[in-house]
Amino acid sequence: MLHPASSRKLFSGSQSVAKVSVQWLLERPCFSLVTVETTELKLPSRVEAIEEAATAVAGFVNRSGISEEAAFGIDMAVREAIANAVIHGNKLDETKLVEVKVKSSPDSLEIKVHDQGQGFDPKNISDPTKEENILKSSGRGIFFMRNFMDEVDWSTAPEGGTSVRMIKRRVN
């Protein structure tokens, strides 16, 4: 068994070796250090949870270094996706959860929102820019998601529920 003083020396030596090893790797042309951060939220299907989850995601987005303008659009898209999951997907059934996963990488921000509802086909959603839909009080959420994000796609899980995946690429 190591004596505590010996283990401190061993640890500090290991730290130095690790720093040198990382530096050596970074100097190689085929290696780079990539930081990927993720966060996951699970929330009940209540209207109040939409604001709480959107605020948590906005904090993550702001810490990720996304521009203020992009962060505004991401916030709108996230709020709409979560609201759709809570209201339309899970139909405000508090026994059903909405899962939100956010992943920040050097080239993009990816957000997934999954509900436990029946699912739907986004192709069947009316175009909110058509004259007959302009004055409707709802129906713009998917339009906002598609316009504020670079990629938006939906999938239905075999066990039920709908997932929306939204990606915002970073501008270098």
Where are these predicted regions, by residue range?
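Conserved short strand/loop->alpha-helix "switch" segment adjacent to the catalytic nucleotide/phosphoryl-transfer site
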Residues: 55-79, 134-137
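Extreme N-terminal basic, low-complexity initiation segments
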Residues: 2-9
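Conserved beta-strand-loop-beta-strand hairpin that lines the nucleotide-binding pocket
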Residues: 2, 25-40, 86-172
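Generic detector of N-terminal low-structure segments
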Residues: 13-14, 33
